[in-house]
């Protein structure tokens, strides 16, 4: 009888423990605390403005909190995210093309685009080839004709050396038959390149549609061609590389990442919450005002897209590293 009572007591205790465990799981259902979003640039930049716009509209059980960790062109913040706990409470807002360039340029041996979990992409930005009003050129063909007739006269700005922006530009320059006829000038970011173009220190630049939106509106920047497969909504009258017979179409999505091994539950929760924001007409209006284009891409599709770009861009980064 005592033995039977002991068995019953053991079962009751075990059941109580399981029940307590289940209750704890319910209490700690994700997210049970604020989710930090690392923005790897200073406040006021494109990634910062975009994330704060998402924070304005997102509906989560816990708040999404912005944490700016800038430096080294966004790499310091990216590495901070890489080394963070994979518990779903720290994510990264970043441009996948920058994430790719850190590895392809040799800044790190870690393949961050695959060593971070892709949550989703939310908007597209586009590299655009532009000139200034001082040049007098209205079309790509006019610029190319001048460059061929005046070797060495054109300085062409890019937003950084060993970047996707520069790799795209090298490929476009080659496709236009201008290799050796123009001088590429790398700057530290889009704002610096844009300023140089306005001051006529350079005559052409490759820069983001979001970075040039205000100067295009004022007439100081003349967009000649978008490096994309479709025309950006912000620049509907600007032809694309494909329209010009150039097979270079690397868009610039902006998206969100989590440390490797973050649970699928957390990834799905965040992706679904962000997807709802991207479908919000007010959010769409906000990002279009920034020169961006709302376009939700889930994590798997986003990762696959970037993997294809990596394969395409690797030989060009090798060329850049060799100084060719």
Write out the residue ranges for each language-model feature.
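N-terminal (or domain-start) structured segment
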Residues: 21-114, 153, 177-206, 296, ...
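C-terminal lobe and pocket-closing loops
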Residues: 211-279, 308-312, 323-324
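An extracytoplasmic/periplasmic, membrane-proximal ligand-sensing/linker region
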Residues: 32-34, 180, 265-324
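A ligand-binding cleft/hinge motif common to bilobed small-molecule-binding domains
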Residues: 96-107, 170-176, 203-237
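Positively charged n-region of N-terminal signal peptides that target proteins for export
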Residues: 1-4
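Hinge/capping helix and adjacent helix->loop/strand transition within the periplasmic-binding protein
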Residues: 58, 80-90, 103-192, 241-246, ...
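Bacterial N-terminal signal peptides
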Residues: 8-16
């Amino acid at each position: 009888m005592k033995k039977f009572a002991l068995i019953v007591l053991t079962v009751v205790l075990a059941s109580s423990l399981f029940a307590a465990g289940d209750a704890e799981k319910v209490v700690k259902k994700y997210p049970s605390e604020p989710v930090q979003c690392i923005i790897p640039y200073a406040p006021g930049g494109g990634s910062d403005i975009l994330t704060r716009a998402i924070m304005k509209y997102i509906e989560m059980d816990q708040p999404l909190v912005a944490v700016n960790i800038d430096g080294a062109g966004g790499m310091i913040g990216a590495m901070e995210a890489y080394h963070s706990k994979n518990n779903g409470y720290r994510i990264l807002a970043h441009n996948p093309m920058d994430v790719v360039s850190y590895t392809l340029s040799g800044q790190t041996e870690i393949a961050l685009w695959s060593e971070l979990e892709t949550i989703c992409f939310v908007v597209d930005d586009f590299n655009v080839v532009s000139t200034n009003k001082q040049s007098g050129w209205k079309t790509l063909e006019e610029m190319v004709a001048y460059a061929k007739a005046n070797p060495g006269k054109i300085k062409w700005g890019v937003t950084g050396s060993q970047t996707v922006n520069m790799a795209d530009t090298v490929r476009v320059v080659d496709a236009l038959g201008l290799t050796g006829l123009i001088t590429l000038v790398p700057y530290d970011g889009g704002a610096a390149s844009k300023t140089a173009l306005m001051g006529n220190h350079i005559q052409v630049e490759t820069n983001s549609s979001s970075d040039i939106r205000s100067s295009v509106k004022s007439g100081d920047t003349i967009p000649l061609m978008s490096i994309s497969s479709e025309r950006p909504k912000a620049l509907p009258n600007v032809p694309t590389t494909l329209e010009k017979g150039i097979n270079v179409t690397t868009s610039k999505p902006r998206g969100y990442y989590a440390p490797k091994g973050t649970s699928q539950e957390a990834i799905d929760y965040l992706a679904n919450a962000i997807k709802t924001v991207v479908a919000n007409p007010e959010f769409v209006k906000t990002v279009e005002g920034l020169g961006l284009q709302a376009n939700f891409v889930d994590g798997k599709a986003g990762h696959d897209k970037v993997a294809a770009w990596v394969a395409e861009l690797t030989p060009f980064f090798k060329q850049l590293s060799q100084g060719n």
